[in-house]
Structures are given as structure tokens and as C-alpha cells.
């Protein structure tokens, strides 16, 4: 009997298949196993049966977090195709997923959720169900359902648990079919408050000071999925008062906010970043938000807006604050324009948070070079418990904040290299992403291994 069949058998008798190796079948039940379950297992397999007794709370928690379902054949027999999409989206929402991956594999479609930055699998579905699911998503996203050879992207909103939830959809032709990735754009009840982002007090003070300026360019940088959007929208929410006119140009509008004039670009209709920016400048804005600076033309438009009496906020894909300055110059932005307009750069990453209920220090402290961090770091481990199941729950942000001081402006104008810029910034009090990560490890917020997974060791150490 294969694993999907064993999974279905266990579920039939209110158990959960935890593992099935060549010699052992490991099953979890509430309180004690029923005779029916044991008889069925012994009839189905000659392997040794190991039973783990869970409380009802553990079983309910496991079910809600992993969304155990029937295997493909049984699932599709008892569950209409239309319900598969709802269950998948609902699972993503309940488990705090940021992305849903639906991808063709051998003899099945694989579904995975990205939770706290790591992909977790859901049960596979059959090729027919996968194709039907992909087609339904393309209809919702207003994509060409007959086009299978070219990538497409779109957006849709559905109601889940009584709330409107928006997703961004992107398709990609692959061997065996189309791969679909959904990005959850709006999380229900998501707080947008700069005070809860996780910045250190000095960083928060620098951020607040930049937002109080009547003009200038504030950039938030980092890779996809590093929390830039929440930081940007939190800043907009702080500025969102009755006496301020805020306009944004986005692709797409990720979080609708009341009293903001949010415009989504539509390149196929001729509505581009540059076109919207030109129109926004005729709308008497006080604050302009540009979803992302993707090219030199957009960068120059943003800087010119910042030089003409507007506070401009945007994002960029770079690894650190100082690299942002070099990246903008590579886009063709003149050094004098950059030094005169830029007021603050924030680089950020997200790391998984240790579960406070089961974390503990084990083994010897971790020693790293003194030039990276001056003291040993605690070695944290979290085996998992009823609250988290795998040792981590949620994520926390690490920040690197660079105020553009007169000295930094002079260095930018002088075409100073990244290393020298970072040296001067650190001498002025800037703490790097890795240094803030080490501080988070000291505080028990995350592990050193998680820090290395996200950032790697600096300077090749």
C-alpha cells in the first residue's frame, strides 16, 4: 500500500500518518488508537506500527496548519473541482502564506505554500485537476485561457471567510504544463504602523525624520518578499492625514488604503509608470509613492519630482543601502541629482522568528570573527511544539537605515565606492543588516543558522 492510500486509511479512522519508512508506519491519534485502525493497518501492511498519542488540541492544530486532505484519487472523488481552488486559497490564508505555487510534475500537479519564507507542500492533485485549477485561475485573473505558450500575469479578488482577499497571478510555460504562482496581496487585519515594523529606536527616529521633510526621495530596498511593501504602506499610513494629498503609481495596487489616490499601471493600454508620473505631477500632490523603480527613466522622474517640492517614496532591488547609491548611478542617474534629492535609504530582510514556547539554548556559543560581531552568539534550537509545530512562527524584519547626511552627499558626488561609503556610514553610527541580525540572535528572536540562510556571512568570512 502506497503513502496516499495509507494517508486515506488513517484519516478514515481519525488518525494522521506521520511517516512511512521501509520498516515502520508512524501514526498519530487522539488519546489511544481504535481497534479498527490497528486492524486496518495490520491488514494493509506488514510493517511495524508505531503510535503517537496526541491531545485533541494537538490534532486540531495539526489539521489547521497542515490542512491534511484526502489523497488525490479520494479527494477528487468526494470533492468537486470548484472546491479545490477555494480550499487551496483558504489554506494559504489560514497558514499565513505569502505565495502559492501550482506546478506540473510527473503524473500530478504539485501545490506548495510559502510560509515564513519557506515552501511547504500540500497534497498533490491529478493532472486533470491541476489543468482545471490553472484554467479557473486564468479566468479569475482575466488572462487568455487559450494561451499556453507565453507567460501572463494579472490580478483578482475573491471572498474568503467573509473578507475580500486579493491575489496577483503569474503563469509560466514549463515542461508538462503551465506553472502558476499566486502572491497574496492583502492580508486580513495586517497592521500598517511604522512603530511596529521592528526598527531599532535610532532607525525609527531617522525614518520618522525623513517622512517629516517637505521634499526628498526615500527608498526601501531588498529582494522580493523582504517586506518592502509593508514598510512603504506603513509610511503612507503615517502620512495619511486630511491636509496631505498622497498619490501612488503601482503595479499592482497591493493594499488599498482609504483617502489615497492609488493608480495601477496598464502597459498594454499605454498606462506606464512614466505616463502616470507625469499625470500625477499635475494633480497637486504632496507625497508620491512609486511602487518600484525599474529603469533609469523612472529613477530620473522620481528624483526630479523629489527636487521640485514633493516627498517621493519608492522601492528598489539591491542588497544593501550603500549598493543602492551605486545601482542608481548604473541606471544613468547623475551623481549630483542623486546627492541633492536622496534623503534616506532603508535595506531590509525577513527572518523566521523562534517559537518562544519551545526555544532553548543548546551546546556551545557560536564564535564568529570579531570584525563581524565582537561576542559569541547563543546557539538556539526549537524542536517544535503544539504552538508552532516546527520551531518557528512568523517572521521579524531586520533593517539597515542610511540617512543621507552632508558627508554622505559629498561622498556620492565624489563617486566613492561602496566599501568606502559603508565604512563612513558605520563610523557615523549605521548598523548593518548582519549586525542587526546578530542582535536578533542575542535577543532570542531567531537563530544564527536562519541569519546565514537569509543573509550569508559578510565579506566572505
PLM regions and their residue ranges:
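Short, basic, glycine/proline-bearing loop/turn elements
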Residues: 23-25, 69-75, 192-193, 261-263
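Short, charge-rich amphipathic segments
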Residues: 14-23, 64-73, 142, 167, ...
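Short, flexible helix-loop junctions that flank or precede catalytic/ligand sites
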Residues: 12, 78-91, 95-461
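Short alpha-helical interface patches
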Residues: 12-14, 21, 43-46, 51-68, ...
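Short glycine/Trp-rich loop-beta-loop segment that forms part of the substrate-binding cleft
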Residues: 26-63, 198-209
Amino acid at each position: 500500500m502506497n503513502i496516499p492510500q495509507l494517508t486515506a486509511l488513517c484519516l478514515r479512522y481519525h488518525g494522521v500518518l506521520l511517516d512511512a519508512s521501509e520498516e515502520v508506519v508512524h501514526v498519530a491519534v487522539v488519546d489511544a488508537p481504535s481497534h479498527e485502525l490497528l486492524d486496518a493497518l495490520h491488514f494493509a501492511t506488514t510493517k511495524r506500527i508505531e503510535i503517537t498519542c496526541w491531545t485533541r488540541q494537538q490534532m486540531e492544530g495539526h489539521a489547521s496548519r497542515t490542512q491534511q486532505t484526502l489523497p488525490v484519487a479520494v479527494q477528487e472523488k468526494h470533492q468537486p473541482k470548484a472546491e479545490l481552488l477555494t480550499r487551496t486559497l483558504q489554506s494559504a490564508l489560514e497558514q499565513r502564506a505569502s505565495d502559492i505555487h501550482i506546478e506540473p510534475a510527473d503524473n500530478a500537479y504539485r501545490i506548495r505554500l510559502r510560509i515564513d519564507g519557506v515552501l511547504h507542500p500540500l497534497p498533490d492533485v491529478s493532472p486533470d485537476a491541476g489543468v482545471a485549477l490553472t484554467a479557473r485561475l486564468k479566468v479569475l485573473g482575466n488572462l487568455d485561457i487559450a494561451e499556453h505558450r507565453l507567460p501572463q500575469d494579472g490580478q483578482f479578488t475573491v471572498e474568503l471567510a467573509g473578507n475580500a482577499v486579493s491575489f496577483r497571478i503569474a503563469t509560466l510555460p514549463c515542461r508538462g504544463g503551465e506553472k502558476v504562482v499566486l502572491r497574496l496581496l492583502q492580508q486580513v487585519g495586517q497592521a500598517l504602523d511604522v512603530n511596529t515594523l521592528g526598527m531599532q529606536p535610532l532607525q525609527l527616529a531617522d525614518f520618522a525624520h525623513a517622512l517629516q521633510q517637505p521634499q526628498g526621495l526615500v527608498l526601501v530596498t531588498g529582494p522580493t518578499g523582504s517586506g518592502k511593501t509593508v514598510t512603504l504602506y506603513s509610511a503612507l499610513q503615517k502620512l495619511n492625514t486630511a491636509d496631505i494629498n498622497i498619490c501612488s503609481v503601482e503595479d499592482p495596487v497591493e493594499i488599498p488604503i482609504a483617502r489615497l489616490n492609488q493608480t495601477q499601471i496598464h502597459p498594454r493600454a499605454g498606462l506606464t509608470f512614466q505616463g502616470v508620473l507625469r499625470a500625477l505631477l499635475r494633480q497637486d500632490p504632496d507625497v508620491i509613492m512609486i511602487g518600484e523603480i525599474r529603469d533609469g527613466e523612472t529613477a530620473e522622474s522620481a528624483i526630479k519630482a523629489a527636487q521640485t517640492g514633493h516627498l517621493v517614496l519608492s522601492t528598489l532591488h539591491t542588497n544593501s543601502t550603500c549598493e543602492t547609491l551605486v545601482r542608481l548611478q548604473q541606471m544613468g542617474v547623475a551623481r549630483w541629482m542623486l546627492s541633492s534629492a536622496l534623503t534616506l535609504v532603508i535595506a531590509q530582510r525577513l527572518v523566521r522568528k523562534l517559537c518562544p514556547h519551545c526555544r532553548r539554548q543548546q551546546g556551545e556559543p557560536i564564535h564568529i570573527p570579531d570584525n563581524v560581531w565582537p561576542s559569541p552568539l547563543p546557539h538556539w534550537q526549537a524542536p517544535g511544539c503544539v504552538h508552532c509545530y516546527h520551531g518557528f512562527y512568523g517572521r521579524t524584519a531586520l533593517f539597515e537605515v542610511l540617512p543621507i547626511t552632508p558627508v554622505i552627499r559629498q561622498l556620492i558626488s565624489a563617486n566613492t565606492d561602496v566599501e568606502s561609503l559603508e565604512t563612513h556610514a558605520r563610523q557615523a553610527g549605521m548598523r548593518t543588516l548582519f549586525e542587526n541580525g546578530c542582535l536578533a540572535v542575542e535577543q532570542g528572536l531567531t537563530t544564527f543558522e536562519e541569519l546565514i540562510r537569509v543573509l550569508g556571512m559578510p565579506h566572505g568570512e
